[in-house]
From Swiss-Prot:
The keyword Phosphoprotein applies. Abundantly expressed in the stomach and duodenum. Low levels in brain, ovary and pancreas. Residues 25-37 have a biased composition (Polar residues). The modification Phenylalanine amide is found at residue 92. Residues 96-101 form a propeptide. Residues 1-21 form the signal peptide. The gene is Gast. This is Gastrin. GO terms for biological process: G protein-coupled receptor signaling pathway. SMART domains: GASTRIN. GO terms for cellular component: extracellular region. Residues 23-101 are annotated as: Disordered.
Amino acid sequence: MPRLCVYMLVLVLALATFSEASWKPRSQLQDASSGPGTNEDLEQRQFNKLGSASHHRRQLGPQGPQHFIADLSKKQRPRMEEEEEAYGWMDFGRRSAEEDQ
């Protein structure tokens, strides 16, 4: 019985995802189906979206995929430094084991 509920939930979520285009307004479908435009066109569309957003949303700025990727690259740099520090600690453990032999 629980397995059936899980299957039904997955089915409903999949149908909702694939039928998303059917409930979007025609103007949004045309925007999505248009070919790749210039960056200026993309920026203008993002600006238009922000124009109808609330004051707080406009303060956050555009949240497109480009900005998301840039944020991820900023977050990955400190991790690399932490990993380099961890290698020194791991090397210390290895050297201690070699000295005991």
